[in-house]
């Protein structure tokens, strides 16, 4: 049974007024009586709509600079009253039923994000009446529709037209879920903000607590269910932040191909975040969350060709990311050369999409162009807890490097060193990257000892016939012993970039001098676990 409820009276009180006039006009045209408050009521009246101020309806004025508007029994009784059960008491107290509540809340997140926002500003943007009405209407969803998203306005009008001015219980229940999600996210923002202000508020410090409040409330929205998780016996889903600020795998649109898997999304994220490091046309190929080939060039076609040459075996079934539009020539090169799981780029030409369409299973994602990298938080789940840290947005330029050896790097060695340092940031620790002429030639990832990562990078280069002599090597952390330098020298590396900071730095530098290697210290580590 659909359990339809007619909408005869609606209360509208919104901070975000996008679409509210048109929605109110549609409701009024269908015979719905409009109640409203403050700025919303003034806007509707200015547009010629018949609207009753809540203060006139309740007989009680707004007061305390608008802090008290809707907190009245005639409002909440009208919302919470159970049809067929509370009718007598509603009639006794002259409480009219309110069939629809349209509310979105004070812009707390936007307020506290503004530079110079004071605690007092934040406090005044904590909505009280709004969440109370939202929760009341959601609780009584059997009789009342609660609308918190302007994106639902059109669908609601269409359903009312299809049901003689009524909404079904299924729709009201779905709207109630959205309402509880809305208030939960709102309260989470407030709790996080105040949690970060605890020391300052109690006089323990002149500074706020910082990025990490004493309780962390997170709000993510399910974007899609996965066929399964990392393995076929695990269930999984993909959740995204409500307001993603940066082009990412979360914002990407899939324009062709099979449904994305859990591993596809994880690997695509790794590839895209790596390719964002480069200003020049770049290509990153990822397999099992590790780059297996990276290159920059004057075109993405050449960048792809050079990235593929690093490790064609591992590139099979990989994820390919670009930082420029996917063009037809590059799309043809990929489709003709290899099996690929996912291609992601800021955009793709129509000709390129016609070419990839020939391989229907290939997933093509368009993420949009990104600007400056947005600061944020990284999370790592542990059993019973959550590790939280800032995103690793650390970068170094040539002017920040310290040459610690007798020999200075050549211009090409320096360029290659900076290039492979960017790549090493996205390779699982212990990470070693060999690079020459703006392309990776060997990558050693995830080994328990750094020397073995160095050896693997050399083996990879040798297997593909790539010349290591004259190359640069990046290490994501310091060398605890000289053996990693000896291994690199044996392979032909002539320049090393690493953080430094080992108690045996002197021995490591001496080893580099013995081999005639130029060594650069970044004073910044890039562990990745």
Swiss-Prot record:
EC number(s) reported in the record: 2.1.2.3, 3.5.4.10
Domain of life: Bacteria
GO molecular-function term, one example from the UniProt record: IMP cyclohydrolase activity
Biological processes per GO annotation: 'de novo' IMP biosynthetic process
Pathway: Purine metabolism; IMP biosynthesis via de novo pathway; 5-formamido-1-(5-phospho-D-ribosyl)imidazole-4-carboxamide from 5-amino-1-(5-phospho-D-ribosyl)imidazole-4-carboxamide (10-formyl THF route): step 1/1; Purine metabolism; IMP biosynthesis via de novo pathway; IMP from 5-formamido-1-(5-phospho-D-ribosyl)imidazole-4-carboxamide: step 1/1
Database matches in InterPro entries: AICAR_Tfase_dup_dom_sf, Cytidine_deaminase-like, MGS-like_dom, MGS-like_dom_sf, PurH-like
Record keywords, A-Z: Acetylation, Hydrolase, Multifunctional enzyme, Purine biosynthesis, Transferase
Residue span, MGS-like domain: 1-148
N6-acetyllysine PTM sites in chain numbering: 287
Catalytic activity annotation: (6R)-10-formyltetrahydrofolate + 5-amino-1-(5-phospho-beta-D-ribosyl)imidazole-4-carboxamide = 5-formamido-1-(5-phospho-D-ribosyl)imidazole-4-carboxamide + (6S)-5,6,7,8-tetrahydrofolate; IMP + H2O = 5-formamido-1-(5-phospho-D-ribosyl)imidazole-4-carboxamide
GO CC field: cytosol
Note on domains (UniProt): The IMP cyclohydrolase activity resides in the N-terminal region.
Annotated family: Belongs to the PurH family.
Name of the featured protein: Bifunctional purine biosynthesis protein PurH
Native source species: Escherichia coli O6:K15:H31 (strain 536 / UPEC)
Gene: purH
């Amino acid at each position: 049974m659909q359990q339809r409820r007619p909408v005869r009276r609606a209360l509208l009180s919104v901070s975000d007024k996008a679409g509210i006039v048109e929605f109110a006009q549609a409701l009024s045209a269908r015979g719905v009586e409009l109640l409203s408050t403050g700025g919303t009521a003034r806007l509707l009246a200015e547009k010629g709509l018949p609207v009753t101020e809540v203060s006139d309806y309740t007989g009680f004025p707004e007061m305390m600079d608008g802090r008290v508007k809707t907190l009245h029994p005639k409002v909440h009784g009208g919302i919470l009253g159970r049809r067929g059960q509370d009718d007598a008491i509603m009639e006794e107290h002259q409480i009219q039923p309110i069939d629809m509540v349209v509310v979105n809340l004070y812009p707390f997140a936007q307020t506290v994000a503004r530079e110079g926002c004071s605690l007092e500003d934040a406090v005044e943007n904590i909505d009280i009446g709004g969440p109370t009405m939202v929760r009341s209407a959601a609780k009584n969803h059997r009789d009342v529709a609660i609308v918190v998203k302007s994106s639902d306005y059109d669908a609601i009008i269409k359903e009312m037209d299809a049901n003689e001015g009524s909404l079904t219980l299924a729709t009201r229940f779905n709207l109630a879920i959205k309402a509880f999600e809305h208030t939960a996210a709102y309260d989470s923002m407030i709790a996080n903000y105040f949690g970060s202000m605890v020391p300052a508020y109690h006089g323990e410090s002149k500074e706020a607590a910082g990025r990490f409040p004493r309780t962390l409330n997170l709000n993510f929205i399910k974007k899609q269910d996965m066929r399964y998780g990392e393995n076929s016996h695990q269930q999984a889903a993909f959740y995204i932040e409500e307001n993603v600020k940066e082009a990412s795998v979360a914002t990407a649109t899939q324009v062709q191909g099979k449904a994305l898997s859990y591993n596809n999304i994880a690997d695509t994220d790794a590839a895209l975040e790596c390719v964002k490091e480069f200003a020049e046309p770049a290509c990153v190929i990822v397999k099992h969350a590790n780059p297996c080939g990276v290159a920059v060039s004057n075109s993405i076609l050449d960048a792809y060709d050079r990235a593929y040459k690093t490790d064609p075996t591992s590139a099979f079934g990989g994820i390919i990311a670009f930082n420029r539009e996917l063009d037809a020539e590059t799309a043809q090169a990929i489709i003709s050369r290899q099996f690929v799981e996912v291609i992601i780029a800021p955009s793709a030409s129509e000709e390129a999409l016609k070419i990839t369409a020939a391989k229907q299973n290939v997933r093509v994602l368009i993420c949009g162009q990104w600007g400056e990298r947005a600061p944020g938080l990284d999370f790592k789940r542990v059993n019973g807890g959550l590790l939280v840290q800032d995103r690793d947005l650390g970068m170094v330029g040539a002017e920040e490097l310290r040459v610690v050896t007798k020999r200075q790097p050549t211009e090409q060695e320096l360029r290659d060193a900076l290039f492979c340092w960017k790549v090493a940031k996205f390779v699982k620790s212990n990470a070693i990257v060999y690079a020459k002429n703006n392309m990776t030639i060997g990558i050693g990832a995830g080994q328990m000892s750094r020397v073995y990562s160095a050896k693997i990078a050399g083996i990879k280069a040798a297997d593909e016939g790539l010349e290591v002599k004259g190359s640069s090597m990046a290490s994501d952390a310091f060398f605890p012993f000289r053996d990693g330098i000896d291994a690199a020298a044996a392979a032909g590396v002539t320049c090393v970039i690493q953080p430094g900071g080992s108690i045996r730095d002197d021995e490591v530098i001496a080893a580099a001098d013995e081999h005639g290697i130029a060594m650069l210290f970044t004073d910044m580590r890039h562990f990745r676990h």
